[in-house]
Amino acid sequence: MKKLAITCALLSGMVVSQVWADAASDLKSRLDKVSSFHASFTQKVTDGSGNAVQDGQGDLWVKRPNLFNWHMTQPDESVLVSDGKTLWFYNPFVEQATATWLKDATSNTPFMLIARNQSSDWQQYNIKQNGDDFVLTPKSGSGNLKQFTINVGRDGTIHQFSAVEQDDQRSSYQLKSQQNGAVDASKFTFTPPKGVTVDDQRK
């Protein structure tokens, strides 16, 4: 009886692992169907009790695997740009830009996961699939991300994604008007405006 219980437990674990692997493979396959795109987005942030914290909007340009431009326009403007090597974060309000190596950037943020779409990143999560919805839970509990959900169609179109942090704050993003196709290379370059303080952390 004990041997049977152990065998059943092992088989159950193998089945679950296979389901997670299949979900990860399907998610990556769907995202691979679109190599570059532009979309506008709306943002809604709520606290652990469901109270509204912030509403925002902006635009997103991606050329996988390492080029992207995340431009938040409201309520406060901010820009996150990767030229493939350097990751720039620019805050016009405080007139400051920060430069870090992209290779050193954390992979446990929803946007980085979507923009890079690398197998090594997805392998860090247990992934469950329900139709076009994918729910990701980090295998390691050391980061700030508690859960990540993304809805992506079979054609690779991302409709929405959300992230829940350890304190249960939720950030939800609705993407609309996704346009698949070539993106102007200028969207993936950044030159700090004159007078802006640059914090260069690449040294």
UniProtKB/Swiss-Prot annotation:
One of its GO terms (cellular component) is outer membrane-bounded periplasmic space. The keyword Chaperone applies. InterPro entries: LolA/LolB/LppX (IPR029046), OM_lipoprot_carrier_LolA-like (IPR004564), OM_lipoprot_carrier_LolA_Pbac (IPR018323). NCBIfam families: lolA. Pfam families: LolA. Keywords: Chaperone, Periplasm, Protein transport, Signal, Transport. It comes from the Bacteria. It is found in: Periplasm. Residues 184-203 are annotated as: Disordered. Transmembrane segments: none annotated. PANTHER family: OUTER-MEMBRANE LIPOPROTEIN CARRIER PROTEIN. It comes from Klebsiella pneumoniae (strain 342). Residues 1-21 form the signal peptide. The keyword Protein transport applies. Monomer. This is Outer-membrane lipoprotein carrier protein. GO terms for biological process: lipoprotein localization to outer membrane; lipoprotein transport. Participates in the translocation of lipoproteins from the inner membrane to the outer membrane. Only forms a complex with a lipoprotein if the residue after the N-terminal Cys is not an aspartate (The Asp acts as a targeting signal to indicate that the lipoprotein should stay in the inner membrane). Belongs to the LolA family.
